[in-house]
């Protein structure tokens, strides 16, 4: 089983640890518009890992530094959403499970995503380290991220990033109009893009069960 699979056994907003095989449910964020860019270029995941390992050796990076960054992100998330969990206890433990079999954690989070993420400063901790090595090998992907970001425009993305090791990228937007505008910019640059929306956990499982019945 691939390390990407456990996420889809829970759905919604989750915390993934290690290679992604350890996953904990978090309070759901409000649905947000998203654009997924799927460039024609391919990226070798094994090569991306080798390049990242080489960069870590070159810069003297250690696993402890990554762990510290994860702890800072977790504190920022908990502070922003007032998620009080006993130390060492996974989110949602001991609560009644929903249709997904996953206990709810504090309910869906009200308020616009911009307030939940941007104003709390959590976006400053969101990063994909693969960008540092993948963009060196594939500069066109860095340009696609720039297009998705739309910096300096009224319809700028809340966040844009490489997805995993690539080559897909994504952008998050407050409004559908902003997402459609970003998708239009991609298509004008000859890059395939898809406008979609994130799903909270309950909606994810509702649609999964309906699809299974069909």
Explain the meaning of each model-derived region.
Residues 166-169:
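Conserved glycine-rich beta-strand-loop-beta hairpin in the small C-terminal domain of fold type I
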Residues 1-21:
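Contiguous, small/hydrophobic- and glycine-enriched helical/loop subdomains that border
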